[in-house]
Amino acid sequence: MTDASRASSSGHGDTVGDLTTGSRRLVGQVRVVGSGLLGASIGLRLRQHGVDVILDYVSPAARSLAVDYGAGRLPAEGDAPVLVVVAVPPDVTSEIVARELASWPDALVTDVASVKVAPLAELRARGADVSRYIGSHPMAGRERGGAVSARADLFVGRPWVIAGHDDITYRRAAAVEDLALDLGATPIEMTPEEHDAGVALVSHAPQVVASLMATRLRDAPDAALGLAGQGVRDVTRIAGSDPALWTQILGANASRVAAVLSELRADLDRVVDALEAPDAPGSRRTLAESIGSGNGGVARLPGKHGQQTQFSSVIVMVDDTPGQLARLLTEIGEIGVNLEDLRLEHSPGAQLGLAEVSIVPEQEDRLVTELEARGWTVVGAFA
């Protein structure tokens, strides 16, 4: 079993406790090239551990902003990083990685780009020393980028893919795993090919679907948009992403994303055919099977601790006044129920909202009883 596999299967991946005690695995300077959301978030967490973080980026303004936010310091004479993390857009990742490999011959270099096959192939084509390069990718992010959106806890509990390859011979190759663990993430080993196929399915194709669905809203009547509830908001939540960045990501993983979307297109064609002739034999079965297949797929998504878990939802009415949501969350904690997920939905034209609280089924009855006893209006509960 590899080091990263041991970490994620032996309890070593339970990193939150390690972070709160201030322990760390990385020893030595870490150089972060890139001062956006990921680069600055990496710097913020490592600085909390006392790591000497060196920030560098092509934009002096962006770099200075990240430094001001406490994500690291400016480069200085005598720097000797043991690990270099490249956090730049995908279209320049291989170029910057090659430069860093040449500039720091005693350092391991990793990147956090959202594709892994293309950078490795480009580095080999450049003749770069890939024995000291390991691609990686944290499955974490936010809708808005830049250092101003950075968070020290961005990676806590999130998968961090380590995409190794056969040419790695560097003696301190485990430093990428140490980085992931110090950031609170769970290291997962994959080949570059496995990674790119996986993210095409769970990240890249969903971005396209969200954007295309949101496009349908551009010219929709105001009256129709006024009916929007949580369903359309869930489907389009990531549609506000950066077009320039996503053009690079999709282009770098084009064939794999196209394969997923081609399967989706075939399913959509079947649904459209059924809707155009709803009374034709088999049409209603097609519709039912489409919805049912989706039930099966979403049930396979892991919960926040990585396991596949069925949660119960308790829907609570919350007044749209300052402090009400905070009071609800505080009282759920006082009751002793662990919150697995939370969704909010505002009723158009009403001074209230609905909080959908996800919990393990065994705690549903107790939570409903305790909340109602404390004066909350529970409008529904279901598995």
Regions found by a protein language model. Give the residues of each.
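NAD(P)-binding Rossmann-fold cofactor-contacting core
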Residues: 49-69
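Rossmann-like NAD(P)-binding element
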Residues: 77-108
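Internal alpha-helical scaffold of NAD(P)-dependent oxidoreductase catalytic cores
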Residues: 154-240
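Interdomain hinge/lid region at the active-site interface
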Residues: 221-294
